[in-house]
């Protein structure tokens, strides 16, 4: 069993001296890959039950579970390790196993016993109360206990920064994060700290690193997170890359796109909230989003709205609409509209917002006045302590909801997903 690893992670793979291991860093640094490898190596040697946690259970399948599945195959362990997809579980011939749970289904955590190892992936997305609950689930009569937490850095208002580094309001200091960025690996009390960036992943292509560098030009906050791997103070604007341009210029740009993807989304309203419909176009190669048409009205009954939007019944353009209103969708369908409900799930509000933020530019026609009014200054809501709430805003942006729905099944290339940071023997190393 031979596996290439990145040198910056060699020490981490076999160091189990501390109870907590906190890995923070930029995109493509191979954090998750090496955590998964570390756990597999541990469970091959010792009979343990490991619990892998994400905030939303369903996100495991294409992330952590997929990663373990690939590792087992790459390491040629299929004869002693079995990956079961329903329910997701990894079983070892020595009795070890890895189980996967989500904090969105807390009741399923209550039946778990004898957990000696927990990995919280994307721990910044888990609530602090959830973290403390997991500490209570980490118990075993004989084996040493370990918790691994991995994340990209977010704002300094996130609990991960306050718990593992410093909380100025509570006058609590654990470690200076700037010292970690300089030294890269630090052991403090019972916590092993590890910092990494894309530069530590020798298996990444230069083109990927260049994409991260380009973030500096259009999203400084994301550059700090993705390229530098640093915590910091997030700007309050949700879409700093949003810009307004003359309608003719927008339409010309769309006409020049190589195979543009065009979509329509609708958010329902009535009295105080608005019916918002947007037409958007995506330049997949440039990662540009164009918004070139809008409808924005309230106080109308469904029949009046259908009459005003009758062009869609004629063109049969597919409209992705708010699935929370199945009766309204059915009404429009009965009146000739090609309308379906968009995918919504627990946590989708945050995930859809993150998706839209991944566009390099969001270019809006100056004719879409309500979209501009809502999105250009759109800011995050804050709690009573002034901390940003990532899935809440200072207003209810109906046009943003319409964009979410329009693009529900389209994925902006995520710089984190473009390279999973998983060393492959067949891939040439980056020099």
Curated annotation (Swiss-Prot):
May function as a terminase. To B.subtilis XtmB and phage SPP1 terminase large subunit. Pfam families: Terminase_3, Terminase_3C. The keyword NAD does not apply. The keyword Nucleotide-binding does not apply. Dimer of a small and a large subunit. PANTHER family: PBSX PHAGE TERMINASE LARGE SUBUNIT, PTHR39184. Keywords: Viral genome packaging, Viral release from host cell. This is Uncharacterized protein YqaT. It comes from Bacillus subtilis (strain 168). The gene is yqaT. InterPro entries: P-loop_NTPase, Phage_terminase_lsu, Terminase_L_C, Terminase_L_N, Viral_DNA_packaging_terminase.
């Amino acid at each position: 069993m031979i596996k290439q690893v990145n040198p910056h992670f060699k020490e981490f793979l076999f160091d189990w001296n501390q109870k907590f291991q906190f890995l923070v860093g930029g995109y493509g640094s191979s954090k998750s890959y090496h955590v998964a490898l570390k756990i597999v190596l541990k469970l091959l040697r010792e009979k343990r039950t490991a619990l892998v946690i994400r905030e939303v259970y369903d996100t495991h399948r294409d992330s952590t579970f997929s990663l373990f599945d690939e590792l087992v195959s790459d390491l040629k362990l299929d004869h002693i390790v079995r990956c079961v997809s329903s329910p997701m579980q990894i079983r070892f011939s020595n009795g070890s196993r890895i189980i996967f749970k989500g904090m969105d289904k807390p009741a399923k955590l209550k039946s778990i016993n004898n957990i000696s190892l927990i990995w919280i992936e994307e721990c910044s997305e888990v609530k602090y109360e959830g973290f403390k609950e997991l500490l209570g689930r980490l118990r075993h009569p004989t084996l040493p206990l370990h918790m691994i937490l991995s994340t990209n850095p977010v704002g300094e208002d996130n609990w991960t920064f306050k718990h593992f580094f410093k909380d100025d309001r509570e006058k609590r200091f654990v470690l200076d994060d700037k010292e970690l960025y300089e030294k890269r690996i630090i052991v403090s009390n019972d916590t092993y700290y590890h910092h990494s960036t894309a530069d530590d992943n020798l298996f990444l292509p230069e083109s990927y690193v260049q994409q991260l560098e380009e973030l500096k030009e259009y999203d400084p906050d994301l550059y700090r997170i993705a390229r530098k791997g640093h915590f910091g103070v997030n700007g309050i604007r949700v879409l700093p890359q949003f810009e307004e341009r003359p309608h003719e210029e927008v339409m010309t740009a769309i006409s020049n796109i190589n195979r543009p993807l065009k979509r329509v989304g609708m958010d329902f309203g009535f009295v105080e909230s608005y019916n918002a419909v947007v037409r958007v176009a995506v330049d997949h190669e440039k990662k540009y989003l164009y918004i070139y048409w809008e409808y924005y009205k309230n106080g109308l009954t469904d029949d009046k709205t259908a009459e005003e939007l009758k062009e869609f019944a004629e063109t049969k353009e597919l409209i992705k609409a708010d699935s929370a209103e199945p009766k309204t969708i059915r009404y429009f369908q009965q009146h000739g509209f090609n309308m379906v409900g968009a995918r919504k799930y627990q946590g989708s509000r945050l995930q859809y917002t993150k998706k839209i933020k991944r566009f390099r530019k969001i270019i809006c026609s100056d004719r879409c006045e309500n979209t501009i009014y809502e999105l250009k200054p759109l800011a995050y809501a804050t709690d009573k302590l002034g901390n940003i709430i990532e899935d809440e805003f200072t207003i209810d942006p109906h046009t943003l909801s319409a964009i979410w729905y329009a693009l529900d099944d389209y994925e902006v290339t995520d710089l984190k997903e473009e390279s999973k940071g998983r060393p492959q023997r067949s891939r040439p190393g980056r020099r």
